[in-house]
């Protein structure tokens, strides 16, 4: 496998820390050891997160093309668009963000606080669009790029989650390589890695990276899209493409992509009771915050799988904390009493 042949522009602090979740593990019976790899602490650029790791491989391409404007898309409380805005500010580039109405959640401040507030503060041109949730290529995004061209600019397209970008899976191939180095220092290997999946390239990159040592199917995706067939297809497609890019040396199969579909409801962006219990439990036992759109659902999945005995006794499970906490203020009504 050869990731090193791709240029990488450093946007992160370096390897993200692995933190033992001792109190949560003990609360759940102590038979499974839980750890978190803190991608939410990976950068000083507007709270960072998993997209910042991905963007390290997109930025060299944008600079090589002479682009002057990063154009991306997400929901109103998109972590992706906030991270793109931060990178644009860091590089001295312009930024256009399409923010669609992906979540059926009504709150007077939903489009004024959290991620979208930070994007505006960083100087992004934020464009609210009424279109609903979809993880594919969007007309509104293509129209935004055309508007940049018509104004004399040179846009660089960054799709939702970086996922449909040809290089979108590379960052999390690097994640797997980083984990292997940390495992050597820790003196053990993780039996499972739990990760939230929606647009797919985070899990896809992990699948490829861990396939290099036979652990592709030990990456347990927790669907938060509530459109699992679409997400599974996209993860698989991106993983196959990424495997070819890095010369993995073996094909990615359907069996390599594990996606647990039990925790996404009621729909994208809306938490269920299990999501909320997981968010509060993790906060109160570990002081680690998760959000109701993504990480709360993957945390719910991990906790429930431990409770059901789906991880063998003695297993060491690594939870990939991808970020998302800046969106919490947009859900303040839900958490008004903690």
UniProtKB/Swiss-Prot annotation:
<comment type="function">
    <text>Catalyzes a cyclopropane ring-opening reaction, the irreversible conversion of 1-aminocyclopropane-1-carboxylate (ACC) to ammonia and alpha-ketobutyrate. Allows growth on ACC as a nitrogen source.</text>
</comment>
<comment type="subunit">
    <text>Homotrimer.</text>
</comment>
<comment type="similarity">
    <text>Belongs to the ACC deaminase/D-cysteine desulfhydrase family.</text>
</comment>
<dbReference type="InterPro" id="IPR027278">
    <property type="entry name" value="ACCD_DCysDesulf"/>
</dbReference>
<dbReference type="GO" id="GO:0018871">
    <property type="term" value="P:1-aminocyclopropane-1-carboxylate metabolic process"/>
</dbReference>
<dbReference type="GO" id="GO:0009310">
    <property type="term" value="P:amine catabolic process"/>
</dbReference>
<dbReference type="InterPro" id="IPR020601">
    <property type="entry name" value="ACP_carboxylate_deaminase_bac"/>
</dbReference>
<feature type="active site" description="Nucleophile">
    <location>
        <position position="78"/>
    </location>
</feature>
<dbReference type="InterPro" id="IPR001926">
    <property type="entry name" value="TrpB-like_PALP"/>
</dbReference>
<dbReference type="GO" id="GO:0019148">
    <property type="term" value="F:D-cysteine desulfhydrase activity"/>
</dbReference>
<keyword id="KW-0663">Pyridoxal phosphate</keyword>
<protein>
    <recommendedName>
        <fullName>1-aminocyclopropane-1-carboxylate deaminase</fullName>
        <ecNumber>3.5.99.7</ecNumber>
    </recommendedName>
</protein>
<keyword id="KW-0378">Hydrolase</keyword>
<dbReference type="GO" id="GO:0008660">
    <property type="term" value="F:1-aminocyclopropane-1-carboxylate deaminase activity"/>
</dbReference>
<dbReference type="InterPro" id="IPR005965">
    <property type="entry name" value="ACP_carboxylate_deaminase"/>
</dbReference>
<dbReference type="Pfam" id="PF00291">
    <property type="entry name" value="PALP"/>
</dbReference>
<feature type="modified residue" description="N6-(pyridoxal phosphate)lysine">
    <location>
        <position position="51"/>
    </location>
</feature>
<dbReference type="InterPro" id="IPR036052">
    <property type="entry name" value="TrpB-like_PALP_sf"/>
</dbReference>
<dbReference type="GO" id="GO:0030170">
    <property type="term" value="F:pyridoxal phosphate binding"/>
</dbReference>
